[in-house]
A protein has these predicted regions:
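Short N-terminal helix/helix-N-cap motif within the alpha/beta-hydrolase-1
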Residues: 158-162, 189
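Short, glycine-/aromatic-enriched active-site segment of Class I SAM-dependent methyltransferases
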Residues: 179-206, 210-217, 229-231, 239-241
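Short glycine-dipeptide loop
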Residues: 171-177
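Short catalytic micro-motifs in class I SAM-dependent methyltransferases
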Residues: 151-158, 202
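A SAM-dependent methyltransferase catalytic signature shared across enzymes that methylate proteins
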Residues: 7-14, 210-228, 290
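Conserved N-terminal segment of class I S-adenosyl-L-methionine
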Residues: 1-151, 161-166, 228, 297, ...
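A C-terminal cap/extension of S-adenosyl-L-methionine-dependent methyltransferases
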Residues: 4, 228-323
Length: 323
């Protein structure tokens, strides 16, 4: 464990705004960056993914195809307004559904994913090149990319400035960096109660618009546009229904397991009930995912945003090398 300062302002903040799982999130009074301090070592953080101990398991990522593809198609609609094809690198590719959707519309996809099960799924099931390694200038034999993308990954970077410089190094001049993240550093603290968890310690940094601008400027990028979506209604809905959803989906999983494995002597009526539970989950799950999608990207685009929780999509371009 080590104490750190704001990576931009080099200020050692004493303002603790988040406490979770024995860790503290401190907020820089100048740029709004929220950072975990003291924090675990790099090897300890990597082990969370290598041993599948992250809050969202690899099995959940892989099974959540409908939601992942829905969100991917939305973001690809924005991406195609600035770049329509080319070599695409996704950092933190999860189960690879964004890459698969991008391939359908003309991109050549490549992924980086630390979780072994998900990386293997991308390679073996989706047939997409994927390296099970952190970002470096030697990934995919030093290939240069036309687009680098990541979603809800920036908070995991151990050294964001170093990692964004690596992104810059693997990109063609004038190519695009596009990513989705939160704006927690801009959010009034009384809204923090609507977050069910902050996923400490695997989320090490939470950015404000100011700190994101500093990060991009220092690492050779120019911000072209930021899309903003208010997520407070989505947070409230998920908080209010958390207990119900947990009980329902747990019951459906158990019923599905019983229907597939089955105990000896299980009645026909019991099997039918189990199958009905599994079918109900298969119907309600996508409806729930679509409702969350509408709240985030359609309703959220219209609602007030200042000081409130948002999901933001940043469009940035690599500055061209002079000479």
């Amino acid at each position: 464990m080590e104490e750190i300062k704001c990576i931009f302002c080099e200020i050692e903040s004493s303002q603790v705004v988040i406490e979770e799982n024995g860790y503290q999130g401190k907020k820089c009074p100048q740029c709004g960056l929220i950072y975990v301090s003291p924090r675990p070592s790099f090897d300890e953080i990597v082990s969370l993914y290598g041993h599948d101990q992250a809050h969202i398991s690899s099995a959940s990522h892989i099974s959540d195809s409908f939601q992942k593809r829905l969100y991917a198609r939305h973001n690809l609609g924005i991406i195609r307004s600035v770049v329509k094809s080319g070599a695409l690198l996704e950092i933190g590719a999860g189960a690879g559904y964004f890459l698969d959707e991008a391939r359908k519309i003309g991109f050549y996809p490549f992924g980086l994913e630390l979780n072994p099960a998900q990386a293997d799924f991308i390679r073996s099931e989706l047939k997409i090149p994927c390296e099970e390694s952190p970002l470096s200038t030697t990934v995919f034999e030093g290939k240069k990319f036309d687009l680098v993308y990541h979603c809800d990954v920036i908070g995991h970077f151990f050294e964001p400035i170093s990692d964004f410089r690596k992104m810059n190094a693997v990109m063609q001049d004038g190519s695009f960096l596009i990513f989705e993240t939160g704006n927690l550093g801009d959010v009034d603290q009384h809204y923090f109660k609507y977050f069910q968890r902050f996923q400490y310690p695997d989320h090490l940094f939470s950015f404000s618009t100011d700190s994101l601008s500093k990060l991009l400027d220092r690492t050779g990028f120019e911000v072209l546009k930021i899309y903003r979506y208010a997520i407070l209604p989505q947070l409230i809905l998920n908080q209010l229904t958390a207990g119900i959803r947990q009980r329902f989906f747990k019951s459906a999983r158990q019923q599905g397991s019983s229907a597939n494995g089955g105990r000896a002597g299980k009645t026909a009526g019991g099997i039918q009930q189990s199958r009905m539970g599994l079918t109900l989950k298969m119907v309600i799950g996508p409806v729930w995912d679509y409702l969350n999608y509408l709240l985030r990207y359609k309703v959220g685009a219209l609602l007030p945003k200042k000081g409130r929780p948002q999901s933001i999509i940043v469009i940035a371009q690599k500055r061209k090398t002079v000479g």
